[in-house]
Each structure stands twice: as C-alpha cells, then as structure tokens.
Amino acid sequence: MAQPQRPYDALYDPNFTVAGPRDHYRQQTMAGGFNIERAPVYNNFFSELPHHPPSTLRLKNADRVPAFVDRNYRPAANDPNDTRQRSDALAVSGPNRPKYFRRPMLAAAEIHIKQAPPSQLPPLPSHQDLNATAPAAMGGAGGLGEPRSKTIGTQSDYRENEAQTAPWEPGYVLPAPGALTAKQAALMRRYHTDVPEVLQLKDLAFPDGLPAGLQEVTRIDKMRAKRAFEASLPPIDDVARLPLRQRMIEEWEAKEWEEREQEILSIQDKRLELLDNALQVREEELDDENRLRVEARKEAMLAGRAGKFADVQATRIKTMRQLIENRKYVEKHRKLHKPTIVERYANYGSGTYAPLQREGRFPESKPLGKEIETEGYAPVTLKGVVDLESFLPSRLLNPRVAAPQKPARLDYHQRKEAAVQRDLKAINDLLDTAKGTAGRGFGDCWPAPLQDDGGAGMGNGTLGRATSTVGKGTLGAGGSAGGAAPGGASMALLGGPSTAAASAMGPLASGVSGSPSRRVVRAIERPPTPELPQPPAVTAPQHAAVVLLQRLLRGRAAQNIMYEGRVRRQELIDELRLEEVVSADGTKIDGQPIRRPEHRDTATLRIDALVGSAVAEVAAILAETDPERRETLLAGLDVSRAHATAAAVAAAAADINASARAEAEEAAATAMAEAAAAAAAAAAAAAAAEDGGAEGAAESAAEAAAAAEAAASAAEEAYAGAVAAAAAPARAAALNLEALGISPEEAEEAAVRIQAAFKGHKARKEVAAMRARGEMLRNIMANGDEAKVVTCQAAIRGHLARKRVRQLRASQAGNEGFAGAPSASPEPAAPLPALAENQDQQEPQPQPQPSSSSGALDLADYDDHHGEASAAMLGGEPSLAVGGSREGEQQLEADAEAEAEAEAEAEAGAEAEASAQAGAEAEAEAGVEAEAEASAGAEASVGAGAEGDAEAETEAGAQAEPGPEAEAEAEAGAEAEAENGAEAEARLGGEEEGFREGEGQGGAAAGEAGPGGELAEGEGEAGEGEAAE
C-alpha cells in the first residue's frame, strides 16, 4: 500500500524518486522551509490607498535542515531494466491494448496481498508493459530484475476551468508571391504589408488584447498609418534625399512621442479621477458612519432621558398620593381597623365595587359561565313581588330552625369508613383545585384515579372511575364497582359493613390486580349556544325589516367587492376567454373578421410606418443613458424634422411656381385671342363700310382699327413677356461676366454661398429656439411620468404640423407676390426645368426611413435623404418643382441620386477646389455686384445653376475637411460672404426679398446640418458653408 510522504523525503529517503530537478526543488519548497509573515512599510504606515499598502508580506526562514545536508539534485543511474521495460511498453497494440491499461486507485476496501512461494511463480511473459494490469515479477530466463519505480495510477487534482489555457489557433501557410489572389495582393498593397495583415497582430492574445476593443482598433489604425508612412519615405539608398528622410522620421517620432505623452496624461487624469472618486466614496462612508454613530448615541441619550423622566414622574405620583393620604389625617387620627361589610358597601371605592385583580383575575368574582342573570326575573313592582311569593313554595319563605342534635357515638367500622371518606374528599378537593387553577379539565372532563373492580367476590372485573358530586355530599364507586346493588351508594352513607369493606379494599384491589390500566376518554361538553331574548310582538316587523336591510347591505357589499375584482382583472379575463370568442380558423372574433396588417391599404401602412418610426426614434433617444449623446440625438431629430419641412415647403413652392407659369401662359393665350377677335371686328367693319354709308363706315373702321391696335399691342406685350420668360436663362448666360474675370460656374458658386449665408443666419435663430424647446422637452420627459411623456409627444407632433402649415402659407404668399411680378418685370418666377422630360426614365430610389427596431439612433441615417433635401433647398434646386405635389416624392428620390453623384464628384475634385478657396471672397463680391446690377436676372441665374449649387455646397463641405487652417479660412470667407449676401439682399426688390424670406424660413433648419447629417459646432455655422464632419 502507498504510504504518506514525509516533508523531507526528497533529501533523506534514498528511494524517493522524482521526474526531474524541478520536482526535486518543488518538494523541498512544499516541506515548509519558509513561512510568510507580515512586515510594515514605514513610509506608508498610515496610508489607506490600495497601491500604497501600509504593510507587505515577506518570507521568514524556518528551515530546520542542517547546512551539511546536500540539497542538490542527484539523478539516479539509468537502469537497463527500466529501459527494457519502457521499450516494451508499446508491445501490446491494436484492439487488445485497452485491456492492459491500469485505472486510478480508489480508496475502497483494504487490499490484502499474499506472497506466493518462489516455486509457484508464473513464467515471465514475453512482452511487458508499464500499464499492464499485474506488475512483472522478478526472475525468469533473461534474469531481469524488478524496475525501480512503478506507475500505480494518474489522476489530476485540477478542474477543467483551472487547466484551461489559451484557445487553440490553427497554423498558417504563407502563399507564394505568384499564388496570391487579386484581392490578397490589393489588400497587401493597400496596407503596405508583405504578409497578410492579420499576422501583424500575433502579439494579441485573448487575456491581453482580445477580444479587440477601441484601444486595439486605434492601435491597428496607428500601425497602418506607420506602415503607410514608412512606404512613403524616400529610399535609403538615395543620398540626396537622406536629409529629407531623416527630417520626416524625426517629425514622425516627435508626433508619436507627443501622442504617447497625451496618452500618458489621459491615463494619469483617469487615475486621478478614480482616486478622487475613491476618496469621495470613502468620505461619504465615513460621514455615514459618523452620522449613524451620532444618531445611535442620540437615541440612547434620549431613551435614557425618557427613562429618567418616567422614574421622576412615577416618584412624583407616588409622593403626591402619600401626601394626599396623609393630609386626611392631619386633624383626625387614623383608625386602624378592618372595615365592616356595611362600610365596604357604603364606600364606592372599596373592593366590593372595584375589586383588585390578582394574577389577572378578580378573586371575588364568579367563575366564567356561572353568572346568574336576574334581569328578566327580578320583580320591579309590588305586584310582581306578590306574584313571586305566591309562586314560591312556603318552605322557601318560612325558614325552619331545628335544634342541633348530639352526634351519636360511632363504632370501629363507622370510624374507618369516615376516615376513608375524608381521604377521598381531600383527593377530590385537590383535583377540583387543580381543575380551577391550573386548567387541567373542562366541565366533567377532568382527571380522576381509576379503580380496579376485579377480584373474587367484587363483581365481574370491570374498571370504574371514582366520581364526585360536589355540593351533594355523596360519593359512589361508579359503574359496577364491587358488584354492589343500586342501593350501594346509600348503604355507604349509612355505614354498612360490606360497603365500607368494599370501599376500603377498592384502592388495594386496584394496586394488586394484574390487569393493565386503560385510559377512559370522555366526550367534551361544549358550552351552550347563547340565545337572545325574543323581541316583543310589537317590534317584530321592525326587527324583521332591520334584519332584511342588513342582509341586503351585506349582499351588496359582497357584489361590489366581486365587481371591483372583476374590473381589476378584466384584461386577464379577456385574455383567458380569447379562445372562446376566436373562431376555429382564427380569422374572426365574435363573428367579425380580424383585420390583418397586410389587408390594409398602402396609405394606412405608410402612415403607421411613419408614426411607428417617429415613436421608435423618440423612445430610443429617451432610452439613451449618456446625457451628451441624448442631447445630440434630440438635436439631430429636430434637424431631420426641419429637413422634412424644408422639402415639403420646396414642393409647395414648386406647385405655386407651376401654377403661376400656367396662369401667365393662359393670359398670353387670352391676349392673342382678343387680338384675333379685334382683327375680325376690323374686317367686319370694312365690309360694312363698303355696303353702308361712308360716314358710318368711316367711324366703324376707325373704332375697329383702334381695337385692333389695342389688341395687337396687348398681344405683343404678352408675347414679349413669354419670350422674356423663355429667354431668361439665355440672358443670364449672356451676362458679361467674362469681362470681370468670373466664369459662370464661379458666379453660381458665389450665388449659392450668398444664399447659404443668408439662410444660415436665419437657421441660427431657428436652431436656438429648437434647442430651447428641446431642453424643456427633455426636462419634462426626464422628470415626468408616462402620461406626461405621451402628452409631450403629442404636443411636439402638433407643433411641427402647425409650423409646417405656417411655412407653407408664408411660402405660398411669397410665391404669389413673386408670381405677380411680371406686370412690373417680364421675368418669371423660375424657368421650366429640362429634367421634367426625362423624369419618367429615372428609376425610383427606395425611400430611406429611420429604423424603428434599433435601440440607439444613429445620425448617419439622415445623411442620404435629409441632407440631400436640405442641399437642394438651399441651392434653389428647381427639380423639386417637377410634377408638383403629386410627383414630389419621385423627384426627391431623383434629387437624392443626383446629390450623391455631385458629392462623389466634389470629393474627387477636393484638391482642385482647395486652391480656389483663397479667391472665394473676391468672387463672392463680384458675384454680388453682378447680381445687384442685374437683379431682374439674378433669380433665374440661381435657378439655372441648381446642380452647380449642390456641387458647390458639397465642395464647401469637402473643403472643410483638410485641417484647422482650411476650416478657419472657410469660416472667414463664409462670414464675408454672409455680409455681402446681406447687402445684396437688401438691394434686391421687395418681391424678391419676400420670396427669399419664405424660402429662408422653409430651409432655416437645413443650414444647420452638414453632409454627414450631424449638427455643426456653434450656432449654425454649417449654414454658412462650414459643414459639420
């Protein structure tokens, strides 16, 4: 059997075997050569910080092994027997190999091994195995000895989670340069690596760096940037560019050192913040402990004070009572005598009227249930007394007094019987006392000794219980005790010898008899049910009515309770009864068909989708835990609503422009018709002049000629207006801008910037109001309940609807004023777009909608549809007017596609546009002057260059990306353009200003968002040309 190992077997036991030097020294360590003790750190002696502990742990040498004992590892010599046995370990293979495995030994029953005599040892098998079931025996033909060590069994002490290591990762094979796919080659060229990029992350392991987070992603980006930088360095063999390479490397290293310093500073700031929080928490805990201690002390002192007050009050009351009692006998001496019954009844403060309790009971009161009710029997009149006396027998009214007789002398048997009766009476009195005080019985059910009535000459051997009749003076043996006749009880009182002897022998016979005693269980007598006296016959109907009313009230109360419970659980009841009302096929409820969502019309589905998306957006924003992100999302929600309103206003303006153009064309046609009618009238007058008189014909001819001249002039004016309206783009293109050194594209870009500056100025005011309303809404939603939140949401929707109606009305009024301008100026409101012809050929784009299933709202969702609508609104995109309100949705989709293409072109030419940014201010001023000189054609120029406006808008956003210098330069140019735009707008006509006012209100919020759909820093700088990234 395996013996327990001792601490120093590795040093002293020559047979102790280990696998190697590591296990040898590990056994010495496990022997307990060192003890751990706690040592103070005096520099941090009073510190409570976790990273500056006041004490530490150190090893204390407690080794008791002498110094001359060798601690080195001395491996045992290699034994050929062990080598042979290990070599033959794999001799058994195939399906029979598991039969020779040894299982781990379990501590079950004891194992008794009996050594067999040498002559009966079995022969050595030809193949041996270290894992064989039976160890190999010594001896044999080869003369091999027993190996030095044996493997009894192996079983791990560790669980799976403790033995778990890093997850296994498969190996990889680097492909040959010629075997790379096009994608792999493109990725390697893109990230400047000779091997797959994932191999650059070999140092990331699961405990450290994996799964990847924000820091790992930042690290990967830095590695990519560094490889790109190294690839962009001049070659090292270029001697002429070595200084440039050195300077670039130094700048890069300086940048890395600066980033590292910033990272270290941020880490230190975080540590300081954690320390500050820990100190604050500690101070709060100390304050709480001090407060609790003070409160406990206060409560203890208040309790002590209250106890002292109670003691003083009790002492005061006792002293006052003694003084009052002593004051009674100042003049009159106190008589110390027991009050008589008359005095006790005369004094209403005596114990007769107010008895004192002892042990919770009134000793002089009658026991419970033994009171005598005399209310219904005591006479109250003289006639009642007479009737009572006539009813009572005379022996109760006339007491009979007899002289006491001299007791007769008793003989021996009578005295013995009397002694037995006294003993029985004493036992009976004890039992009655126990019954009345200790509660050992109830009624007649109280314990009593059993008597054994068996025996010769004493009856049939049945058991009886001694009973007593209190107050009657009789005591019988009960049952058939002693086989006595029914008159045995009276004979006992008369002192008969047989009865006395039987009574005397009763207890003895009970003790001597060999029959076992049994327990007699009596039925428990319940107290009688109390009954109320019958009401008089006169009040019987009233009593019955009161009882009926009480029953009705109780029934109604029970019904109200049942009704309240049913109402409170009505939803659950309806849910449980849903199976009863639903038809078998699941298509009807109570006979009515179930209206499925897929059966609704397109308009209802669209409205439900919009309402659901809006509610989901608000719920997602309110569920956001970060206050800053919640404010950003709310601002983005307001911007998206403003974008939608701007798109609707643009569509309404397009409808108004279309109607104005239709009215102008109708007026021109009417004028042409009038001119034709006048010509016909002139011809008729000429014919009449030939047939009629000369004078009348001359007058008619003159009138007809005048009418024809007036109609011709009106038609000529109408035709000139139509021609001017059609030629407005040509006149705008024919402006002599080249003489000023300004190309048409630059003029359009300057016009867009002026308009954006004007609208950005109004957008700042609108956004300020939106932020104020959003802050108030957030406060209400953060502090209110669900009903208030729902009310606020309904108020927001109503406010947005009313605002949209006001903007539409203002835009309609402005366009109506602008449509009336041709009477003063022949220029129409806007030229007809050429895009209307190819509208049917465009493929409709899917309308993007905010996701209502996501938990968090992303502002990037507004990048495509809201940002494009706002860009078209700011640039005066005439394509929004195509098709009117009926085709506005398709046109918005086409504008979104055109805007995406323009944005891609703007990003491709960002570098070329950056060089032209310096002259933007001069170009804007020149454009303003040109627009002021040709105010009649300025609006047409802006409308004709709608695509250029959108491109300039996106180019302005692209130019804001390169760096802080470009942003500052763009901001300065935007401010100058805003001032010039304000001056130019001030010089324009009243009709144009009104139209721009309505358009600016419609697109006010659009100036606050950049191409990314997010809010810009500041108060609406995005509307001035600086797009938010």
Curated annotation (Swiss-Prot):
CDD domains given in the database record: IQCD (cd23767)
Residue spans of biased composition, Acidic residues class: 890-910, 922-932, 964-982, 1016-1029
Compartment annotation: Cytoplasm, Cytoskeleton, Flagellum axoneme
Gene3D superfamilies: 1.20.5.190
Presence of keyword Isomerase: no
Keyword 4Fe-4S: no
Assembly and binders: Identified in a spoke-associated complex containing CFAP61, CFAP91 and CFAP251; the complex is associated with the radial spokes of the axoneme. The complex associates with Calmodulin; the association is calcium sensitive. Interacts with RSP3.
Job of this protein: As component of a spoke-associated complex, regulates flagellar dynein activity by mediating regulatory signals between the radial spokes and dynein arms.
UniProt name for this protein: Cilia- and flagella-associated protein 91
Organism: Chlamydomonas reinhardtii (Chlamydomonas smithii)
